[in-house]
Amino acid sequence: MNNKYFLTKIDLQFFASKKGVGSTKNGRDSHAKRLGAKKADGQMIRTGQIIYRQRGTRVYPGVNVGLGSDDTLFALSDGLVKYQKFGPKQGKTRVSVVKHKLDA
């Protein structure tokens, strides 16, 4: 046979032109949530003002204090803020709003 075909195998490899870079797991940070007491013991407060911002019930609502859906404590009436310890071993804290008459 005059026409003989030779099959040749060409091995072609492409190498990276740029170095591959892995990702890092750092580089994120959340904003501070500004939790904690907004009114101290003995301070005057108006209806609707926030007394304590919290996650979970670290401080429990007392008289004239409401509990929001995010566990925020707020005043239900005007008056003075009063923190009290209660429970066995006085291990829990309750905040109340005591009605206060101003001397005119």
Swiss-Prot record:
Coiled coil: none annotated. SUPFAM superfamilies: Ribosomal L27 protein-like. InterPro entries: Ribosomal_bL27, Ribosomal_bL27_CS. GO terms for molecular function: structural constituent of ribosome. GO terms for cellular component: cytosolic large ribosomal subunit. Pfam families: Ribosomal_L27. GO terms for biological process: translation. The N-terminus is cleaved by ribosomal processing cysteine protease Prp. The keyword Ribosomal protein applies. It comes from the Bacteria. Residues 1-15 form a propeptide. Keywords: Ribonucleoprotein, Ribosomal protein. Gene3D superfamilies: 2.40.50.100. PANTHER family: LARGE RIBOSOMAL SUBUNIT PROTEIN BL27M, RIBOSOMAL PROTEIN L27. HAMAP family: Ribosomal_bL27. Belongs to the bacterial ribosomal protein bL27 family. This is Large ribosomal subunit protein bL27. It comes from Mycoplasma pneumoniae (strain ATCC 29342 / M129 / Subtype 1). The lineage of its organism: Bacteria, Bacillati, Mycoplasmatota, Mycoplasmoidales, Mycoplasmoidaceae. The gene is rpmA.
